[in-house]
């Protein structure tokens, strides 16, 4: 069976290293590039760097060179390579554009893209007829929470969202929290209407306010991987939806599923629910 060639950007990071371990254990994926800007690890076998068996793939900071090699090596194969990106909001947009330009399918797990950047990538991928996926959260459990939140939105007029992550996460609120809010807002109504004029003694105490009236709150602490809560309220009751990621291995089934699916797409999709 021909294996899917996969490049991982952010290979030495928390998520990138988990992805490489999942690829190593899979039967149908093959790591062809481990991209990271950790200069001290340049040229080191990624397997050795992660405390695994050697994988004959050296750590490199050269994204475009890796994309070029991958695009050339698969021209005579049955499908294009896939780039998995878990890097930083400052670089993920350029990484994605470069990947599409080389005919390599980008799967973006890095959050922090602006709405304008997302739409530009959608247009770029669609024009190139290259499948691409922007996935704020690869957890199937999170997809189920979002579906439950969308259903509850019909019955509750008050709702607030809280997301908690480790203190190394650069963007806030998280892409998952924003995506959840967008799914709730698809019902097309306003939330949290009040006749009271609120006054914050400390700016930001009430969280970020969206046009729909939904409020989003962010927590950053060591010891947390990822948590999200959606709290609905009405007179006499509250309804709490909660999801807690204990270990990053929970994301790997979703990552591998996306790798397999994205090569059959001709446009960009946003959200794991679009390809389940």
From Swiss-Prot:
The keyword NADP applies. NAD(+) binds at residues 10-15, 36, 109-111. PROSITE patterns: DAPB (PS01298). Its EC number is 1.17.1.8. One of its GO terms (cellular component) is cytosol. This is 4-hydroxy-tetrahydrodipicolinate reductase. Pathway: Amino-acid biosynthesis; L-lysine biosynthesis via DAP pathway; (S)-tetrahydrodipicolinate from L-aspartate: step 4/4. It is found in: Cytoplasm. InterPro entries: DapB_C, DapB_N, DapB_N_CS, DHDPR_bac, NAD(P)-bd_dom_sf. The keyword Cytoplasm applies. Belongs to the DapB family. Keywords: Amino-acid biosynthesis, Cytoplasm, Diaminopimelate biosynthesis, Lysine biosynthesis, NAD, NADP, Oxidoreductase.
């Amino acid at each position: 069976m021909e294996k899917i060639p996969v490049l991982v950007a952010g290979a030495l990071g928390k998520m990138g290293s988990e992805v490489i371990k999942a690829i190593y254990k899979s039967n149908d994926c093959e790591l062809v590039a481990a991209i990271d800007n950790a200069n001290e690890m340049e040229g080191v076998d990624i397997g050795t760097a992660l405390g695994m068996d050697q994988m004959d793939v050296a750590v490199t900071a050269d994204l475009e060179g890796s994309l070029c090699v991958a695009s050339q090596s698969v021209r005579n194969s049955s499908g294009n390579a896939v780039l998995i990106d878990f890097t930083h909001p400052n670089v993920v947009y350029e990484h994605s554009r470069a990947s599409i330009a080389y005919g390599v399918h980008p799967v973006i797990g890095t959050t922090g893209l602006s709405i304008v950047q997302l739409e530009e990538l959608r247009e770029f991928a669609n024009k190139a007829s290259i499948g691409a996926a922007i996935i704020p959260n690869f957890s199937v459990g999170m997809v189920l929470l979002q579906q439950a939140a969308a259903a509850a939105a019909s019955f509750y007029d008050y709702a607030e969202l809280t997301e908690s992550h480790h203190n190394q996460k650069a963007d806030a609120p998280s892409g998952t929290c924003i995506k959840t809010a967008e799914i709730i807002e698809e019902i097309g109504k306003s939330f949290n209407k009040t006749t009271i004029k609120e006054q914050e003694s400390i700016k930001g105490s009430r969280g970020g306010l969206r046009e729909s009236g939904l409020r989003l709150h962010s927590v950053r602490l060591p010891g947390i991987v990822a948590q999200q809560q959606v709290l609905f309220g009405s007179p006499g009751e509250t309804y709490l939806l909660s999801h807690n990621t204990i270990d990053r291995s929970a994301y790997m089934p979703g990552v591998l599923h996306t790798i397999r699916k994205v090569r059959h797409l001709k446009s960009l999709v946003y959200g794991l629910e679009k390809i389940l």
